[in-house]
Amino acid sequence: MHSSATFDVIVVGGGHAGTEAAAAAARLGARVALVSFDPTLIGTMSCNPAIGGLGKGHLMREVDALDGWMARAADAAAIHYRMLNASKGAAVQGPRIQADRKLYRAAIQTLLAAEEGITVVAGEAAALRLSNGGRIAGLDLADGTALTARAVVLATGTFLGGRLFRGEERMEGGRIGEAGSHRLAGQLRAAHLPMARLKTGTPPRLDGRTIDWARLQEQPSDGGRWTCSTWNNARTVPQIFCAITRTNAESHRIIAENLHRSPLFTGAIGAAGPRYCPSIEDKIHRFADRDGHQVFLEPEGLDTHLVYPNGISTSLPADVQLAMLRTIEGLEAVEMVVPGYAVEYDHIDPRALDRTLQVRAMPGVWCAGQINGTTGYEEAAAQGLVAGANAALAVQGREPLILDRSESYIGVMVDDLVLQGVTEPYRMLTARAEYRLRLRADNAATRLTPKGIALGLVRPATAALFARRMAERARAGALLEAPVATADYGAIGLPLPGDGIARRRIDLLRFPGATVERLTILVPEIESIDRAILSEVVEDAHYAPYIARHEAELRALAANEAILLDPALDYAAIGGLSREMVERLSKARPETLGQAARIDGVTPAALTAIMVHSRRRAA
C-alpha cells in the first residue's frame, strides 16, 4: 500500500457488515477501500457457524433481494438446511443453514476478489481524518498510511475497544488471538459521541471425535429444495446431521458453585449481553427451576472435527467449562479444543444516527453492525448494505436508500435502532414487525428487488434473473386465477360447496385436503413452474384476506408518516408537551410524525400537539 490513496468510500472492518457495505458501495459505482487487520480473515464467522433463523432469515433474504452476498455465500457453504417454524404460517417461518466455516469465508473472499471496485487494505484503522469544517476527509492507519475519501463506514464489530474475559483471565482484543481497535475507540469517545459498552460471548469448541454421537438425538438436514438465495436453485454441498443433548442437575451444580469465578457475576463485566442468547451461567441463575437446557451440537465443517455446542455460551474458567461439559450426555469423554469466552466492546447509541445510518454529529461517517448495538450476522449484513449504499449515494449526490418498516425487516430494524436506541444487543424477531403478514421471507425479492434495480444497487445479471422470475410468477398467477367450473371440484376429489360463490383455482387450496399436487390434475402446466415461485403465489393468496384488514391501518399510518418534522424543531416551544416528552423527542429527533409515534413513552396527546404545531408552521 502506498503512503496515501484516494477512494470514494472507506469501509473499516471485514466482517458481515463490512463486506456487505463494501459490496453495496461498489455495485453503485464507488471506488471502495476495505480496511481489515488481516485480509485472510475477511468473512470469518466469529461465533456460531450458522446463517438465518427466525426474523434473521428474513434479513438474509432481504439482503439477497438487494443483491448482497450473504445468502449466496451461505448456499456455497451450507452443510445443513433447516426451516424453523415449518409447521406455522409462511410469514413467521425462518430459513436457517449450518455452514462450513472455511467454505463460507472462502465464498465471501471469492465474491470480494471478483468485485473490481473494491481495494482491500491491510492495516489498523487508527483515526478518522477530518477537514477544517469537521466533515470526514478519510482515514489514517496505524502504519502512517493516509486514505482519502468523502465517506467512511465503520463496521468494527466487537473490535472497537474490545476486551476478552474468561474466568480470572483478561485480554485485550475483539476476537480470541486478535487485537482490538483502541485508538479509533478513543477518538470517537473524545468526539463526545454517545457511547456505551455491550457484551457478547461464545461457547467452547469441542473435538467431535470425543463425542458419543450414537447416544444423541440426530437432527437431519431438511429434505426440501429451498435455498438461501433467491438467485440460486440448487444445493451443492454435502449435507450432514447435527445432534441434540441437554444439560442436567449435575451440570447446573458445577456452574452454580463457580458463579463467583464468572466475570459476569464478579462485576468484571458490567455491560448488558444479548437477551435471546444468554450465557449458560446466566440461564442457571435466571431459570433456577429448570432441570435442563437444550444443547445443539453443530459440526463446524466437512473437513474439521470441531463442534460448536450451541446453547452454552460461557466465560467461566476453562477448568469449570470442561467439568461442566463432561456431565452432559454424550460428552462424558469430550475434549475441549478452545474454551468459551466473553467479549465486551464499545458501541454508539444508534439514536445518534439518521435513517441512512450516518452519524448526525459527524457528517460523512456511517456505522453498521455491532457498533450500532445489534447482535447477529444477519443484522450486521443488513445494516452494512444500508450504510454502504448510502455512503456511495451521498458521495454521488443522489437520494438516499430509505427502507420503510412497512416494506422490509431492514426498515423495521433501522427504525427501531435510530428511534428507540438499545439497552442490550438488538436482535431481529418477527414479533418486531407489525406488517409481518406481508413481509415473508419467501417474497423478499418481489418486495425489494425493484427498488434495488431502480437505484442501480442490483447488478444487470441479477436484474435479468428477477425479470425471468417475475414472468414466471405472472404465468403462475394467470393459471391459478382462472375460474373454477362445477366439474372441477369432483375432478380433484373435493365436495361441491353448493353456496353459489364463484371461485378461482387458487381458492380451492383453502379447502381441507386440497394441495398443489392435486390441483395439477386440473392444471398440468403447474408442474413446469418453479416450486419456490409457485409457493409464493399460493401464500400471497392465502394471506390476502388477512392483509386486506390492515390496509386501513396502513393508510392511516402513511398519513402520519407523510408529515415531515423539522430536524431543528424546538420541542420545548410546543405547548402541551411535558418535560419528559421534550427530552425523549429531542434525543430521538424523529424525521416524521410516524417515527415520533413509535418512540417509547410518547403519548397520543403529545403527537397531536406536534402535528398541530407542524401544520401551523407549514401554513
From Swiss-Prot:
Q: Which UniProt keywords apply?
A: Cytoplasm, FAD, Flavoprotein, NAD, tRNA processing
Q: Which Gene3D superfamilies match?
A: FAD/NAD(P)-binding domain, GidA associated domain, C-terminal subdomain
- Which coarse location class describes where this protein primarily resides? cytoplasm
Signal sequence span per UniProt?
A: none
Q: Name one GO molecular function term.
A: flavin adenine dinucleotide binding
GO cellular component term, pick one = cytosol
Kindly list the cofactors needed.
FAD
What InterPro entries would the database entry show? FAD/NAD-bd_sf, GIDA_C_N, MnmG, MnmG-rel, MnmG-rel_CS, MnmG_C, MnmG_C_subdom, MnmG_C_subdom_sf
- Give residues annotated as binding NAD(+): 273-287
Subcellular location(s): the record lists: Cytoplasm
GO BP annotations, alphabetical order: tRNA methylation; tRNA wobble uridine modification
Give the residues the record marks as binding FAD.
Answer: 13-18
Identify the PROSITE patterns for this entry: GIDA_1, GIDA_2
Respond yes or no to whether keyword Flavoprotein is given for this record.
yes
Q: Does the keyword Cell cycle apply?
A: no
Q: How does it assemble?
A: Homodimer. Heterotetramer of two MnmE and two MnmG subunits.
Q: Which family does it belong to?
A: Belongs to the MnmG family.
Function text: NAD-binding protein involved in the addition of a carboxymethylaminomethyl (cmnm) group at the wobble position (U34) of certain tRNAs, forming tRNA-cmnm(5)s(2)U34.
Q: What is this protein called?
A: tRNA uridine 5-carboxymethylaminomethyl modification enzyme MnmG
**Upper classification of the organism:** Bacteria, Pseudomonadati, Pseudomonadota, Alphaproteobacteria, Sphingomonadales
